[in-house]
Amino acid sequence: MAKKALNKLIKLLDLEHLEENLFRGQSENIGGPRVFGGQVIGQALTAAVRTVPSKRFVHSLHAYFLRPGDMEYPIIYDVERTRDGGSFTTRRVVAIQKGEPIFDMALSFHKKEKGPSHQIDMIDIPGPEECISELEVKKKMIDKVPLKYRDFFLRERPIEIRNLPGEGMFEEPKKKPPHKHVWMKAVGKIPDDVVQHQAILAYASDMGLLSTSMNPHRLSFAKGNVMSASLDHAMWFHRPFRADEWMLYSTDSPSASNARGFNRGSVCLLYTSPSPRD
């Protein structure tokens, strides 16, 4: 069943080509009328890639969510070919539903080049094998969920998530520092394609990010004492990676004010498998 959920996500991110620079995507049911923001980011990235010269891969993207997406309607992705330079390519993608833009994203792509390289070390925390899966946490609290929602609550998801003890989204809300660490990976093998791994990480990057800024305020989705939505989202891709191997997603929230929370995250990799081919 878990592999079925991943195959469904891969299909969801594989857009229908309508005509030059125009693509159409469908939406998944996440338990409400709105479209999941990570889905739109991943689909918009896929649309942009379809217009980019080969051997150039996204290194940064900056997006704004303009309106809530409606799960019942397809999404049209309109790609603007802003610039094709000697080393860099720039694209803009507008996602449209019912004649109105719901999302706007700028992306920059870069060909492989040699240069200086460094990175920070991974922090010393318990590994994924020492953490309990989010699904197991849900099973322990299923008695608190209304009967009609239980099957959906326990549904298989394409991304496996393991929280450090006391840091899960479904923990009893209590005042905590505005940071957390999550192990995540796709539940099955992803084809050796850089773009698919990037699109799936883009999808996963919007999972649980918002709740980081709620930690100091005893707010929790599990308690239903807060409503939230993403306003914008940015990502930087520094190196090739595999989204089907364990990744540590460390998030923190430097500030929350005026009914807005600022959340940021970094991804460190824990694997020895070869990265996807260029």
Question: What is the meaning of each model-derived region?
Answer:
Residues 1-74, 82-86, 91, 113-115, ...:
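Hydrophobic, proline/glycine-rich low-complexity stretches
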Residues 77, 249:
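Short tryptophan-centered beta-strand motifs in secreted/extracellular beta-sheet-rich domains
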Residues 94, 101-102, 273:
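Local beta-strand/beta-hairpin segments that build beta-sheet-rich folds
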Residues 102-212:
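Segments adjacent to and within acyl-thioester-processing domains across lipid
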Residues 261-267:
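Low-complexity, intrinsically disordered Gly/Pro/Thr-rich segments
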Residues 271-278:
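Conserved small/polar residues in nucleotide/adenosyl-binding loops
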